[in-house]
Design a protein with these regions (language model features):
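Glycan-processing catalytic domains of CAZymes
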Residues: 1-371, 375, 379-391, 398-431, ...
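A conserved amphipathic helix/loop scaffold
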Residues: 374-570, 574-586, 606-608
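Short, aromatic- and glycine-rich surface loops/edge beta-strands on solvent-exposed regions
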Residues: 592-608
């Protein structure tokens, strides 16, 4: 391989891409990785080992510390034809070299891989500030300054757009361990894109860390891009996750795609940028089946992405965390983020986030249908707003260490949780607000399902990763037990119980109060010009039903034997509306089967 050949490859990729997609802008980027994973690097490990941090791989290789300085050498570089002067900051050298390299070879952007610019030990929870036992806040200011200076020095020399990989951890863990000032980096107009979700779910089954970490990094954004990355193949490490990590199951599509953020204006946003790692496998093959099989799920996940705040919203203090010098807060954010990670792994369906700064700008109407989750607020205004929302009937959960919780007096509609309690404490606390999620596991050591719930078009969409398919999951929500479309639910003491496959994605528009029996919910052919959907619900035994139509559409209930017949409208159902749950039909003492009909036309007068 030569630079001339590489430049030709870049040019060919753009030309062929333009032929295939005439209306698209074809960009080709280059990667820089901090370790030895992707390429042999004489520069890192022979000429300039002084830039390698403390973390080692197999006691031989380490990761580049972006805050390091270079010793002098006499090699010829594009940006330094006479060699590198002693004491040159790595950020300056890297920026100048990148500008020359990307320009000369025709690249359009640079991808900073595996945590470069954030940490020199991106997979660890220890670092320059936290050694695993003690925090060293006296090192914080220098660590923050050095990291931020890398970005400023690099950007001074390199004009190309940057995309980032980030670490596998969260904003709070990265700050507590290494002093990563992510809020300052985002706010500095550096022309970077926020890191995408990590591949930790695929690599070690830790969906909680993937989901939690991603939410902390996208509660604020440096630009308009909200990325989602799917781990399809790996061109370096021999695995193709669609088959050998996901078992052909789309769980790592639907769960991260269920994540949403609420921006400063109170609007719900979902991923708008798709990254695929990668289209080719380690042998250079591009098998069609690895595109054709997950593609429908990617499209469906986009179709079902949230358009309103989820039932549970996390208020995350990115700015407060990453500008703090308080040793006790370092411990707080570290323990708190781990607690949320563990709670998600325990089945808490948390998939919506906003920053505390954005939260203060929002009207109460944004959160009418949600339960709010927050660490003990550092900003008194956040605590006062939480109290105000609680006084209006909105549930609030505040978590922290015992010491921090002492500063928060108890108030109505609020649960306080100690982060050093068992991980199931958060899931169990949801019952105080009418949400019961329980598991029947064949062995105590079995990992519970990971669940995401998104709200779209007046429905809830459940996304599930079930680590063990012998586990039963039972739900009971404030409006009744959720009945998922395309499923049968065994009713146990008023809860709907399911035995999920490895990965599930289900729509929910039906909630039921019924003690026992088996309730089935299946889509039926509407066979009707007036109604575009007919959902058959059977197995009803003196049940109370609450049915949520698509936003703004006419809805009715028919008791006809089949949809081929003219609908027989059921007058026992009444249209209702309340601020906490929206618009729905309610019927009581219903037995047998019904058809839930959803209209074809939008009703301008319908209550949303």
């Amino acid at each position: 391989m030569t630079y001339r050949i590489l430049k030709s490859i870049v040019s060919c990729l753009k030309a062929e891409g333009k032929k295939a997609f005439p209306g698209a802008k074809i960009r080709v980027g280059e990667t820089f990785d901090i370790g030895p994973e992707f390429a042999i690097s004489e520069f890192k490990y022979e000429r300039h080992p002084e830039i390698i941090g403390l973390l080692t791989l197999q006691d031989k290789f380490g990761f580049v510390d972006a805050t390091s300085t270079l010793h002098a050498d006499t090699h010829t570089y594009a940006a330094y034809p006479s060699g590198i002067p002693e004491g040159t900051p790595f950020g300056t050298f890297f920026g100048k070299q990148s500008e020359a390299f990307l320009s000369d070879l025709g690249f359009d952007y640079l991808w900073l891989s595996n945590g470069l610019g954030f940490s020199d030990n991106p997979w660890e929870v220890t670092g320059k500030i936290f050694d695993g036992e003690s925090y060293h806040p006296e090192k914080l200011e220098k660590a923050k300054k050095n990291i931020f200076n890398f970005w400023k020095l690099f950007r001074k020399e390199c004009s190309f757009p940057l995309e980032t990989r980030g670490t596998n951890n969260s904003v709070g863990i990265d700050y507590a361990s290494d002093g990563v000032p992510l809020y300052d980096i985002y706010s500095a107009d550096l022309d970077i894109t926020a890191p995408p979700n990590s591949p930790w779910a695929a690599l070690n089954d830790n969906y909680g860390l993937e989901i939690m970490g991603h939410m902390t990094r996208i509660c604020e954004l440096p630009n308009e891009k909200f990325p989602f990355r799917y781990y399809l193949h790996d061109p370096w490490w021999i695995n193709s996750p669609w088959y050998d990590r996901y078992d052909g199951s789309p769980c790592d599509v639907y769960l991260p795609m269920a994540i949403s953020r609420i921006d400063a204006e109170g609007k719900t946003q979902t991923a708008n940028s798709l990254n695929i790692l990668s289209i080719d496998n380690s042998y250079g093959d591009m098998p069609d089946n690895c595109v054709n099989e997950p593609l429908p799920h990617l499209l469906k996940a986009e179709k079902d992405a949230a358009d309103a705040p989820a039932p549970f919203v996390w208020i995350y203090p990115m700015r407060e965390y990453t500008t703090s010098h308080d040793e006790s807060l370092l411990r707080e954010m570290n323990l708190g983020d781990h607690y949320i990670c563990d709670a998600i792994n325990d089945g808490v369906p948390l998939s919506c986030v906003t920053s505390s700064d954005s939260f203060l700008k929002h009207d109460i109407s944004v959160y009418r249908k949600s339960i709010l989750l927050s660490p003990v607020p550092e900003n008194k205004a956040v605590l006062e707003k939480l109290k105000h929302l609680a006084s209006q009937g909105i549930g609030v959960i505040i978590y922290g260490t015992k010491e921090k919780l002492q500063a928060v007096q108890s108030f109505a509609q609020c649960k306080r949780l100690d982060v050093e309690m068992p991980q199931e404490s958060l899931r169990k606390a949801l019952a105080a607000f009418g949400y019961s999620i329980t598991f029947d596991k064949k062995e105590e050591t079995v990992k519970p399902p990971t669940i995401g719930i998104a709200r779209r078009d007046n429905a809830l969409f459940f996304s599930v990763y079930n680590a063990n398919t012998t586990t039963d999951t039972a739900f009971k929500f404030p409006m009744g037990a959720p009945i998922l479309c395309g499923c049968e639910a065994e009713m146990k003491n008023g809860a709907s119980s399911y035995r999920f496959a490895r990965g599930e994605h289900r729509e929910c528009r039906i909630f039921i109060e019924q003690e026992s029996g088996v309730v089935s919910c299946r889509e039926a052919a509407p066979v009707n010009a007036r109604y575009r959907r007919a959902i058959r619900i059977s197995g009803l035994q003196s049940a109370t039903l609450r049915l949520f139509p698509e936003s703004g559409r006419e809805a009715a209930v028919s008791t006809a034997p089949i949809t081929d017949y003219t609908p027989i409208f059921d007058s026992r159902f009444e249209e209702k509306y309340d601020e906490r749950h929206g618009r729905y039909l309610e019927g009581k003492n219903i037995s047998g089967h019904i058809y839930f009909l959803i209209g074809r036309e939008i009703r301008e007068s319908a209550i949303i």
